[in-house]
Amino acid sequence: MILELDDVSAGYGTTPILRDVNLRVEAGEIVGVMGKNGVGKTTLMKTVIGLLDATEGTITYAGEDVTAAGADERARAGMGYIPQGREVFPKLSVEQNIKIGETVNAGSDDLLYDEIYDYFPILQERADQQAGTLSGGQQQMLAIARALVSNPDVLLLDEPSEGIQPSIVDQISRDMKRINDQLGTTILFVEQNLGVIRELADRCYAMERGTFVDTVGPETLADEDALAEYLAV
């Protein structure tokens, strides 16, 4: 088991958001978390990466208790994070953005420059272009590449389809499958786009009001109508 959350709660100030979350992710899996806006998906991802402290419970990564570890320590341990909204550095070039991701694993022989340009060739073509001038889909590719270049064991993606045209969403979903298949990278993502959930996830947790209410397996993931019920579509 590469990632475990046991009875994890978290929030902002005195406002609780996550309540007694239990999650299991095996190495090499692609696991989704689905739910409508406002159910706590982004809070979950910030808590997993360490940008937000868990107020209760335990987070275990690769067999180690990382509950008290900060985001930088978790990143060095092998977590890569792609936040909602991508958060690329708009005034820096594509290449400079990617080099920022390299600092997590500076000096390593395991950096994945060749691989990221294979997955996202448009980034190599536009290496000198300011990141802020890229399209939304290209910025998402850049955010993934920046997280991937340090060769993390786990990628955490927060709403990877948000604000991106459908054809590019499909392309990014295929790229994430290739990354998982070829590199063995474990992926945990949160999403409310049914197409992305069905395309990517091996299994999925359904989230409501800050906690998981069900685990969805392959049979339900293949049934679009059944899956839509979890999002009240």
Model-inferred region functions:
Residues 147-148:
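ABC ATPase C-loop
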Residues 151:
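Conserved catalytic motifs of ABC-family nucleotide-binding domains
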